[in-house]
Amino acid sequence: MLKKTLAALALGSALFTAGQAMAADYKIDKEGQHAFIEFRIKHLGYSWLYGRFNDFDGSFTFDEKNPSADKVKVTINTNSVDTNHAERDKHLRSGDFLNVSKNPTATFESTEVKANGDSADITGNLTLNGVTKPVTIKAKLIGQGDDPWGGYRAGFEGSATLKLKDFGIKMDLGPASQEVELLLSVEGIRQ
């Protein structure tokens, strides 16, 4: 009887530990330049203008078997906006757009993750230009596995569309430029 009890306890402990090991915390790898927060907006309806934020930090919890337990948290230095054009970047930092002197950071914190086939909808609160609104990011796992340095990584891509006026950006760029698309590529290192 004692052997059966010990065996049951060992099996139960192993299953409990295995279940816990599924969820893992990751730090976004910005130091290795394996993560990007980019955006694009139509320029007069004729072409796309691309930009990015060069300075951000974040983390996520990833459990492939239980996406509802996943979490994402990111902080962006809005002063790091970069469209490869100094005068435009200066204008984007002004009160017409990001107002970085008043709002030096933008943040995203997830509130819910729902699996949707081979992708997921990550809903959370985005604070941009001092305004907080719910946003849903359409995300997809690119891959995961061991890296050559003894670590473990997971990579995702995602996108979301934001209406500028929803975040208090009143500068009118014309009817074709009322929305901005966020384009995300994130690789995290398991902690």
UniProtKB/Swiss-Prot annotation:
Main location: periplasm
InterPro entries: Lipid/polyisoprenoid-bd_YceI (IPR007372), TTHA0802/YceI-like_sf (IPR036761), UPF0312/YceI (IPR023480)
Protein's UniProt keywords contain Transferase: no
Subcellular location: Periplasm
Keywords of the record: Periplasm, Signal
Gene Ontology cellular component annotations, sorted alphabetically: extracellular space; periplasmic space
Signal peptide start-end: 1-23
Spans traversing the lipid bilayer: none
Domain of life: Bacteria
Family: Belongs to the UPF0312 family. Type 1 subfamily.
Official protein name in the record: UPF0312 protein PA0423
Species name: Pseudomonas aeruginosa (strain ATCC 15692 / DSM 22644 / CIP 104116 / JCM 14847 / LMG 12228 / 1C / PRS 101 / PAO1)
